[in-house]
Amino acid sequence: MENIKTVSKLCRSYGIPLFFDACRFAENAWFIKVKEDGYANRTPKDIAREIFSYGDGCTMSAKKDGLANIGGFLAVNDEELASKCRKELLITEGFTTYGGLAGRDLEAIAVGLNEVVEEDYLRYQVGFVKFLADLFVQNHVPIVTPPGGHAVYIDAGAMLPHIPRENFPAWALGCALYIEGGIRGAEVGAVMLGSQAGKQVNGVASRSSHVDDSDFKDENELDDNVFEEDIEHEELFRLAIPRRTYTESHMR
């Protein structure tokens, strides 16, 4: 919370609006409760209210701490900006009363936002992630510690030292997990974070929203140094835990 207060004060001193990525607001509120002095006796809902009081708005993916399978929202405290957003919404998603979402999904989000700040739920969710992290540690699988509230990150670079970084060890681990066990995860490394946007590297196109056919080379023409500046990224593989889905037996 102290970090949020400091950033909020700095932004306001320069007249800069502060917007939160609120997709995991409840988990953040829980960690503030259990880790930060002065918050142990406050509820996650109360802590969340304080967090948002320091901002000017937020974006929210309800697939995370909305406990829904689709949807989200944009919240602002500026009526002029809100009016502009409504006009954009009308031509892209629909009326503000539903924003392109079905009634069922709106109801799921409404229920989810209430349930996600319940202490029993947050204790279970964060504890479940820690349970999986502890299993990895016990089996000498290198992970990022301490674990957070939604996923465990395997250090694929350390786990697979025989695979050079330019050959994407985290990507390789993801493929192997899916082939062997049907386990889906996400590479968080050079392929996702590489700065060679729109370039083909070892036959793989790095992530970019502006890809031009001229950016792609024949595999035989690849420059051995094209990825040199990207291999400094950690090679991680994320195993996000679906909420209220698995038991400890599944994790074992």
Q: What do the PLM-derived regions correspond to, one by one?
A:
Residues 94, 130-252:
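Conserved C-terminal alpha-helix-loop-beta "cap" of PLP-dependent enzymes
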